[in-house]
Amino acid sequence: MGKKKMKLSSLFKGGAGGLLAVPLCYNAKTLSFRVGDDMIKTVNSVFFDHHHNNNNGGDLLEAETPESWFTNSSETASHSTESDQDLDAESLEMVVRGVVRSERLFFDPGVTSSILEEIEEKSKSDLKSKETVAVGEDRSTPIEEISVAVAMESEDPYGDFRRSMEEMVTSHGELAKDWESLESMLAWYLRMNGRKSHGVIVSAFVDLLSGLSDSGAGITSASVSDSARYSTAVSSLPSSPVYSLSQGQTEIQEEERRSC
């Protein structure tokens, strides 16, 4: 007896020996189809490729979906990009204007290429200027800054002026060593007092110099002789207040003698 062979017919073969024809869905109106179509178009920036659908021979029809389901992301992106570009341009223009107005682009080149050397030179120049000012103040200190003018009635003008000058020299030792300072002191006494007192002031000043020379306070005999010649020359001038004062004192003394 012959054996019978069992054969299974393929599920994918039709009656004519071809592939099993699966019917296509031409009406994609169910929710599952809409969601799938929606996801694909969202990834593709919501771009409907009608040319691609036409090339497919109409096998797949485009689903009828309302426009409210999608947003035109390309237009929104373009609007946001344009607004961002406008803001960036305005911000850049404001920054450039601020830099130009604040003069940050202008600089003053230094003398040296090293910052430390420039700082050291500047500090040295500042120190020299301070030292110069300090020395100048010590050398030419006005008599007004170290004295106070006091108006008083005196029965002994010569003695008062002499004591006042001695106090000035004692309290300020540099006066006894600097002839220019002594001259400025004499000029101050003459300027602060009337012409009638100039002769007494000069006499007190000359005696002061003599006392300083004898005590060895720093005034040389040449300075004393210079001051004596100065006072003599001043008093001998007819137009000087000292000369008129001496003449007035002489006349007063003569009148007193006559009255006696």
From Swiss-Prot:
It comes from the Eukaryota. Pfam families: Ovate. The keyword Plastid does not apply. One of its GO terms (biological process) is negative regulation of DNA-templated transcription. Transcriptional repressor that regulates multiple aspects of plant growth and development through the regulation of BEL1-LIKE (BLH) and KNOX TALE (KNAT) homeodomain transcription factors. GO terms for cellular component: nucleus. The gene is OFP13. Plants over-expressing OFP13 show small rosette size, late flowering, reduced fertilization and blunt-end siliques. It comes from Arabidopsis thaliana. Signal peptide: none annotated. Keywords: Nucleus, Repressor, Transcription, Transcription regulation. Residues 150-211 form the OVATE domain. Disulfide bonds: none annotated. This is Transcription repressor OFP13. InterPro entries: Ovate (IPR038933), Ovate_C (IPR006458). NCBIfam families: A_thal_3678 (TIGR01568).
